[in-house]
């Protein structure tokens, strides 16, 4: 049996060149948006979902209370029916600082996933804003920004001040900040995740911001309340495994612009064990495939330029790159065992000998070299120069986790399993302006 892998070579090369183009675009980095004199900063409401987070929630709230922001800031921490001391720790901070509120969900309400928590808080804030609640200073939906920080998140001290001017443009619905891993120095696994986040931020997201296709993450996400209101009573879909990616795509479809701010970051705790990492990445892959349903609407979305729409569709589609690489590797192993014969006319136009070897080497090493250069330049934990080759190989080996998680995701999809987010239809959680005043 003979297998022709010419198509796989061309596909992989196109992907490499596409990301190389994004890297070139990202080299020109505009300065942060700045506010004109006299401009009133929006009211920032930082929402922190928390379920059994007693180990980290206290430090997170302390971090948020210490942020420098000339405008008004409120902190709404949602205890999702925790069974540990999370609620008590939040209540201590609420008693010390009037900007902090505790929203407690009952056992019947809790445990339905992050999307349900965010929707509960959203309805509470929306109704309070429409009612002119004094805790929100009477601000309207266009002047309120709903920020999401995970229970282990740490914003930089000036994050709110840096992000606020991005909302001067009334067409901007959401802004995402960069993500770092604050325990990157604790383990090699955590460092690999830091490389992923920093690399994605500075290699992809900056370029995507320039062409109008910035993506949203689940941590360090800032969204205008008025934009959320255009998505209905539950902006975060309960059935979405990657609710952040889904939300950003629907905002663009609704005509809003999404931005990316690389001038500040949110730090989060990296996973230090393989099992939860595999589970997390499997969910990401499966959620990515779920978002393919957005492709027809994105192709004609009003909230992005032609280049932005092309990038969004391409970004969603390129998740199949892992499948192509997996098939190529499987064929190569089968060939080495003598089961099949592999042929390929890829690079047949390049002269044999040294030119072919150089071309193959460049195509093989260009992605990794670009990624390592980006990380070294922008990381707060850069490697010593003599460590770079070793950890480049380690990162290459680590990247095979995507092959494993893609296989797991495909298995779950074939079995129609979407078990990370509970989706029983039990009705929405009631919220009112009056209830916001009672939360303390």
Regions found by a protein language model. Name each.
Residues 62-111:
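Acidic donor-binding segment of Leloir-type glycosyltransferases
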Residues 101-107, 111-143, 157-240, 282-293:
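Long helical/loop segments within the catalytic core of UDP-sugar-dependent glycosyltransferases
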């Amino acid at each position: 049996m003979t297998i022709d892998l010419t198509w796989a070579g061309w596909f992989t090369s196109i992907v490499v060149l596409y990301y190389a183009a994004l890297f070139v675009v990202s080299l020109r980095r505009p300065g942060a948006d700045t506010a004109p004199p006299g401009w009133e900063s929006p009211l920032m409401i930082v929402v922190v979902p928390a379920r059994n987070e007693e180990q980290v929630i206290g430090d997170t709230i302390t971090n948020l209370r210490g942020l420098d922001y000339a405008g008004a800031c409120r902190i709404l921490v949602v205890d999702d029916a925790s069974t540990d001391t999370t609620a008590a720790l939040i209540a201590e901070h609420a008693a010390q600082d009037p900007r902090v509120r505790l929203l407690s969900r009952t056992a019947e309400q809790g445990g339905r996933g992050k999307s349900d928590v965010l929707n509960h808080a959203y309805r509470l804030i929306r109704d309070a804003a429409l009612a002119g609640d004094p805790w929100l200073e009477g601000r309207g939906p266009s002047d309120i920004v709903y920020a999401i920080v995970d229970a282990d998140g740490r914003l930089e001290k000036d994050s709110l001040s840096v992000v606020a001017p991005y909302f001067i443009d009334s067409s901007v619905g959401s802004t995402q900040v960069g993500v770092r891993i604050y325990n990157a120095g604790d383990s090699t696994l955590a460092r690999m995740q830091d490389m992923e986040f920093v690399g994605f931020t500075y290699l992809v997201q900056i370029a995507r911001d320039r062409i109008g296709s910035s993506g949203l993450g689940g941590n360090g996400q800032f969204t205008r309340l008025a934009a959320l209101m255009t998505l209905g009573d539950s902006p975060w879909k309960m059935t979405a495994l990657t609710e952040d990616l889904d939300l950003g795509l629907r905002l663009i479809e609704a005509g809003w612009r999404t931005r990316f701010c690389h001038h500040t970051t949110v730090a989060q705790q990296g996973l230090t064990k393989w099992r939860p990492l595999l589970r997390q990445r499997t969910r990401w892959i499966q959620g990515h495939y779920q978002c393919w349903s957005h492709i027809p609407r994105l192709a004609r979305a009003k909230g992005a330029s032609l280049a932005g729409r092309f990038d969004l569709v391409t970004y969603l589609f390129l998740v199949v790159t892992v499948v192509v690489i997996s098939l190529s590797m499987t064929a190569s192993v089968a060939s080495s065992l003598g089961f099949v014969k592999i042929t390929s006319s890829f690079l047949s136009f390049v002269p044999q000998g040294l030119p072919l070897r150089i071309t193959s080497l460049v195509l093989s090493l260009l992605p990794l070299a670009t990624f390592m250069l980006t990380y070294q330049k922008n990381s707060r934990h850069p490697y010593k120069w003599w460590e770079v080759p070793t950890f480049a190989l380690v990162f290459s080996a680590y990247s095979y986790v995507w092959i494993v998680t893609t296989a797991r995701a495909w298995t779950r999809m074939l079995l129609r399993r979407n078990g990370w987010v509970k989706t029983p239809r039990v009705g929405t959680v009631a919220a009112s302006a009056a209830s916001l005043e009672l939360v303390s």
